[in-house]
Amino acid sequence: MTEQVQLDENKLIAERRGKLDHIRQACKANGHPNDFRRDSLAGDLQAEFGEKTKEELEELNHVVAIAGRVMAKRGPFLLIQEVSGKIQAYAAKEVQKELKDKYQGLDIGDIIGVKGALHKSGKGDLYVNMEEYVLLTKALRPLPEKFHGLTDQEMRYRQRYVDLIVNDDSRHAFIVRSKVVAAIRNFMVDKGFMEVETPMMHVIPGGASARPFVTHHNALDVDMYLRIAPELYLKRLVVGGFERVFEINRNFRNEGLSPRHNPEFTMMEFYMAYADYNDLMDLTEEMLSTVATSVLGSDKMPYGEHTVDFGGKYARMSMLDAIKQYNPDHAEIQALTYEGVKDRDLMVSIAKSVHVDVESFWTCGQLLEEIFGETAEPKLMQPTFITEYPADISPLARRNDDNDFITDRFEFFIGGREVANGFSELNDAQDQDERFKAQVNAKESGDDEAMYYDADYITALEHGLPPTAGQGIGIDRLVMLLTNTHTIRDVILFPSMRPQA
C-alpha cells in the first residue's frame, strides 16, 4: 500500500468514526442495535417472486424484512448483499433526507436492516421499498474500490473476511467446500461407516511419511506431535471391532508452502474390514461421482483447459507402466522391469536423465516414485488409479502376493495431482515390525520424513487386525478440482502465511 493510499484510507476511517460518534449522540445508544429481525433472504425472494410482474407485486403488497451489507449506491437504490445473494432497497427522497440527518448518510460496507413492500423495477429487478430501516453496524473501514474483488492475492488470504465480502468466486468456492464435506459424510454414513474422532496430539507421530510439528505438554512434561495422519489410531479401532470407520479432520505436516501444499490441511480417512484395495477403488469411483453430482449437478466439469469426467470407470495402471507410457522415447525406461528397479545405480542414472535431483538416502522405490512424479504425474488429468507402489515407500501397506517388491497400494490422481492414497493394510505384525525398523534406519540415514517405531501399534496388530483396506482423500485438493481453482490457498479459509515484515 502506497503512502498516499494509506493517508486517503486513514482520512476515510476518521470520517466514518465521526459518523459513528454522531449516531451515538443522536440516538443516545451505542450505535450497534440488536433488535432488528430479518424474515427473508434475497435468494428465497428471487426464487419465489422473481417471475411475477411489476403489477402483480404491487397488488400483492408483500412486506418483507431484509438485512445485509450495502455494496453499492445507485441514485435512490442501495444494493444489499447477504449470504444468499443480493437485492436492492429503494430510498424515496424523504427517506434519503432522514438517512442523512440521522446517520450522516450511509457508506459502502455499512450493514442495515430494511422493512417494506416488495416491488419490481422497470428493468425487472426486485427491490424493497424502505418503509422502515435501521443502521445495524457502521463499517469503519472502506472496502476495496474495485467492487469485483481484491487484486492483491496475498491480501485476499490475509484478510479473507474482505475477500469474502467483495469476491463472489471466493464465496462460491467455500460454499462448495462445505457441501462437498457434507456429501462425503452422508455417503460414508449411508455405506455403513461410523464417524469417529482420534487424537490430534501424538506421543509418536505415524501414519504417513512426513516431518511433524512438535509441541510440549507441560503437565506431562513430554514432547508431543501434531498428527500427520490418523491412520494408526483408526486401525486400532478396527482391531477393537469397529469394522467401518471414518474421520474428517485436520492433519499437520511441517513442510513447505506451495500451490498444492499447506502445512495444515483436511483429510477424510476411512478403513473397512474384509476388503482390499480393489474394493477401495470401486468405492472411490462411486463416491466421487455421487459427490460431484450432488454438489454441482453433474459428474463432468471444467478444470483449466480440460473437462474432467468423474463418471464411469477410472483408468488403472501400475506406476511402472505409467512411467513407460509418458516416456515413450526413453530407451532405458522402456526396457525397465522390477528387477531393474532394484538396481540402484541404474535408477539413479535414469532419475538424473529426467532431471530429478537425487538424494543420497533414497531407496530404489523412492527413485521410481520421483521419476513418476517428474515425468508422469503432471499429465494425469483424468481420474486415474496408479497401482503397484514399491514396499520400501509403503511401510504400512500389504505386500503383493505375486511380487513382494510391490504392495497392494494405489494413489488416485486427477488434474495432474494426487488426491487420494489407499491400500490393503499390512496386518502381519512381524512384517510391520521389520518395516518400522527399516524406517528407523532410514531416519538415522538422513530421511527426516521416515516413520517412527510405534510399539503399541505392533501390540495392537498382535491382537489381530482382520483383512482391511484403508484410504485417505485430500479434501482441499478435491475442492480445488470441483471449483476449478489452481492453488490450495483459494480453498482454505485461512491458509498459512509468512509473518508480515
UniProtKB/Swiss-Prot annotation:
Top-level EC class: ligase
Keywords for this protein: Aminoacyl-tRNA synthetase, ATP-binding, Cytoplasm, Ligase, Magnesium, Metal-binding, Nucleotide-binding, Protein biosynthesis
Residues involved in Mg(2+) 2 binding: 418
GO cellular-component term (any): cytosol
Cofactor annotation: Mg(2+)
Family matches, as PANTHER family: LYSINE--TRNA LIGASE, CHLOROPLASTIC_MITOCHONDRIAL, LYSYL-TRNA SYNTHETASE
UniProt-listed NCBIfam families: lysS_bact, PRK00484.1
Quaternary data: Homodimer.
Protein known as: Lysine--tRNA ligase
Organism per entry: Aliivibrio fischeri (strain ATCC 700601 / ES114) (Vibrio fischeri)
Gene: lysS
